[in-house]
C-alpha cells in the first residue's frame, strides 16, 4: 500500500517516536491529524496537518481526535498510538497513582482510541482502502525486565490486546500491527513517572526504527517483533 494521500491520526505526536512518524509520513504525502496534550509543542513541530489537543486518558478525548480527522480530511485510514509513559524501580516503591498512570497512558488510552476509530477505519475498508492501527509495545512485551515490572506488564497487555482485537477487526478489513523495537534513543526514559533509568546501552535510532515500521506498514506486515529491528543502530 502507499501512504501518500491517506488520512492518519498520530496520538502522542510530540514525543520522540511520534514526532519522527509525523515528519516521515508528512514527507510521504500523508494527511496527518496530530494529537498531543501540549499545544505549544504541537505548534513547534512545524508540520502541516490538523491539530487535536487533549489528554488521551480523559473521557471523550479519543473521540475528539477521530472527529478532528474526519472534519478535516473526511476519512480516517490509519491510527498510530505513540503515547507512552515509563517508570523505574523495585515494585515496592510504586504508588497506586504511578501504577494507574502507567496503565492509563500505555494501554487503556490505546483501547479507547481504537474503539473510537474503529467505525471510521471500517468505513475506509468498505471504500476500498487498507486501514491500519499501529501500537508500539516494545521489546519489554517479549522480555519483561526487572526494575521495570509494571511497565513490562502494561506493555505486555498492550500487545495481547492487539493480538485479540486484530482477530476481531480483520473481519472488517482493519489491520492491527504491533511493533516491538528494543530500547530506542528517545527522551522517554529521561522523564519517568517514578524512579531513575538504569544505564542502558546505546539504543536504536528513532529515525531508523520509524523507517522500518513505515516500511512494514507499506508492505502489509501484521507484526513487527524485536527481531524485525535487528541490525539497526
Where are these predicted regions, by residue range?
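Active-site helix of classical SDR
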Residues: 114, 154
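C-terminal helical subdomain
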Residues: 178-179, 194-233
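Conserved glycine-rich Rossmann-like NAD(P)H-binding loop of the short-chain dehydrogenase/reductase
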Residues: 28-44
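Conserved glycine-rich cofactor-binding loop
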Residues: 14-15
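Active-site loop immediately N-terminal to the catalytic Tyr-X3-Lys motif
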Residues: 145-149
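Residue(s) in the substrate-gating loop at a strand-loop-helix junction
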Residues: 135-138
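Substrate-binding pocket helix/loop in short-chain dehydrogenase/reductase
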Residues: 90-91, 98-103
Amino acid at each position: 500500500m502507499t501512504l501518500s494521500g491517506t488520512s492518519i491520526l498520530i496520538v502522542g505526536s510530540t514525543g520522540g517516536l511520534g514526532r519522527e512518524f509525523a515528519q516521515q509520513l508528512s514527507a510521504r504525502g500523508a494527511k496527518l491529524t496530530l494529537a498531543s496534550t501540549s499545544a505549544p509543542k504541537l505548534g513547534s513541530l512545524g508540520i502541516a496537518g490538523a491539530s487535536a489537543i487533549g489528554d488521551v486518558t480523559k473521557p471523550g478525548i479519543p473521540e475528539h481526535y477521530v472527529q478532528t480527522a474526519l472534519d478535516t480530511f473526511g476519512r480516517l485510514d490509519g491510527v498510530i498510538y505513540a503515547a507512552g509513559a515509563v517508570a523505574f524501580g523495585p515494585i515496592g516503591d510504586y504508588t497506586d497513582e504511578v501504577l494507574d498512570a502507567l496503565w492509563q497512558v500505555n494501554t487503556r488510552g490505546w483501547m479507547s482510541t481504537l474503539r473510537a476509530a474503529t467505525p471510521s477505519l471500517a468505513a475506509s475498508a468498505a471504500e476500498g482502502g487498507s486501514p491500519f492501527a499501529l501500537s508500539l509495545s516494545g521489546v519489554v512485551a517479549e522480555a519483561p525486565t526487572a526494575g521495570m515490572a509494571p511497565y513490562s506488564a502494561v506493555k505486555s497487555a498492550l500487545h495481547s490486546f492487539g493480538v485479540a482485537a486484530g482477530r476481531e477487526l480483520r473481519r472488517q478489513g482493519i489491520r492491527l500491527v504491533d511493533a516491538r523495537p528494543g530500547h530506542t534513543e528517545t527522551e522517554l526514559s529521561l522523564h519517568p513517572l517514578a524512579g531513575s533509568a538504569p544505564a542502558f546501552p546505546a539504543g536504536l535510532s528513532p529515525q531508523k526504527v520509524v523507517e522500518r515500521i513505515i516500511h512494514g506498514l507499506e508492505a502489509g506486515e501484521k507484526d513487527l517483533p524485536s527481531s524485525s529491528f535487528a541490525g539497526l543502530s
